[in-house]
From Swiss-Prot:
SUPFAM superfamilies assigned to the protein according to its UniProt record, in alphabetical order: Periplasmic binding protein-like II (SSF53850), Porphobilinogen deaminase (hydroxymethylbilane synthase), C-terminal domain (SSF54782)
Name used for this protein in its record: Porphobilinogen deaminase
Species of provenance: Clostridium botulinum (strain Loch Maree / Type A3)
Recorded catalytic activity of this chain's protein: 4 porphobilinogen + H2O = hydroxymethylbilane + 4 NH4(+)
Function: Tetrapolymerization of the monopyrrole PBG into the hydroxymethylbilane pre-uroporphyrinogen in several discrete steps.
EC number of the protein: 2.5.1.61
Molecular function in Gene Ontology: hydroxymethylbilane synthase activity
Keyword set, alphabetical order: Porphyrin biosynthesis, Transferase
Keyword Transferase in annotation: yes
InterPro entries (UniProt xref): HemC (IPR000860), Porphobilin_deaminase_N (IPR022417), Porphobilinogen_deaminase_C (IPR022418), Porphobilinogen_deaminase_C_sf (IPR036803)
HAMAP family with a match to the protein in the record: Porphobil_deam
Pathway(s) where this gene product acts: Porphyrin-containing compound metabolism; protoporphyrin-IX biosynthesis; coproporphyrinogen-III from 5-aminolevulinate: step 2/4
Iron listed as a keyword: no
Amino acid sequence: MNFIIATRRSKLAQVQTEIIIDLLNKKHDIECEKLLIETVGDKILEVSLDKIGGKGLFVKDIEVAMLEQRADAAVHSMKDVPYEMPKGFEIIAIPEREDVRDAFISLDNIKFKDLREGAKIGTSSRRRAAQLKLLRPDLDIVPIRGNVQTRIEKIKKENLDGIILAVAGLKRVNLDHLITDYFDTKEMVPAIGQGALGIEVMEEHPKKELFKDLDHYNSKICVLAERAFMRELDGDCHSTIGAYASIKDNIMHIIGIFERKNKIVKKEITGTKDQYEKLGIALAEHILKD
């Protein structure tokens, strides 16, 4: 059996797809090949995502490949997947999640707490920028886009004091040795779905059940809880929004942030994990009441 899996052209996207292919090969005797697609989000780098259509731009062109039957499935970073799935598509599996934290990479290995006043920090994320300002109001936030390696190179090219990147991506491309500091998930609440990969298929695909074996239940319901939170707040890349759900002894804890009335609101909620979607919605409702 031969499967074609669509993904973006970046090194990180290809590595993430190889992770899924390896997991698939351990479960089934399947030959897989990658279909590399340059999405609109990859082509337009000089403009912030919220001005050109949001993170869904990384997904739409790949879904077209599945619609045209050029691919059987797609691998995405779940943080790039809009909460409203197009008709006929579904996320069939979410494997075990990687480290969800954000990392600080500095020019000369200077710790975040030791940064000079007015230090220039690169990030294109509204979520990260807002939380950085809460931690250090003096910081000068500089928007940067591009793949992981490009952003790292911009530290020197753009005379930055440092940048913020997801730990998961750095680990997957073996660049985590460059990390200067790790942010705790309470001081820098992650993006919805950060660190998780999702396998997207068309609902009518005859072989889609083969991917279900790759599903990691706790990882999946944590991401679904976060996405329920985002859906209730109608959040997207235009929003300053983040959430992180974790499970211990069948108890789910979710921390979420959302910018409302020009103020960052942060709330937490705890409950049994079987109520994961209700917890995400309830957390959003708490924030809207603030």
